[in-house]
Swiss-Prot record:
PROSITE patterns: SM. This is RNA-binding protein Hfq. One of its GO terms (cellular component) is cytosol. Belongs to the Hfq family. Homohexamer. It comes from Rhizobium leguminosarum bv. trifolii (strain WSM2304). RNA chaperone that binds small regulatory RNA (sRNAs) and mRNAs to facilitate mRNA translational regulation in response to envelope stress, environmental stress and changes in metabolite concentrations. Also binds with high specificity to tRNAs.
Length: 80
């Protein structure tokens, strides 16, 4: 069965969600948010920290930095 193509944004967010990697999200207004992605869709990201959830609209996000190195592609395993 052919594998459905996934865009890079969805692949990245799904990887950090599954691996529960802590992120720092910088918004376009300069605000810095940290937490773990619990869910996302085409328009927003649900971020959880200290038992509280924040719904962040993607159009407000400037940069997302994972708190640790992450592997998104199987070929990265072989290269390491």
């Amino acid at each position: 069965m052919a594998e459905r193509s996934q865009n890079l944004q969805d692949l990245f967010l799904n990887t950090v969600r599954k691996q529960k990697i802590s992120l720092t999200i910088f918004l376009i207004n300069g605000v810095k948010l940290t937490g773990v992605v619990t869910s996302f869709d085409n328009f927003c990201v649900l971020l959880r920290r200290d038992g509280h959830s924040q719904l962040v609209y993607k159009h407000a996000i400037s940069t997302i930095m994972p708190g640790q190195p992450m592997q998104m592609f199987e070929s990265e395993e072989a290269a390491s």
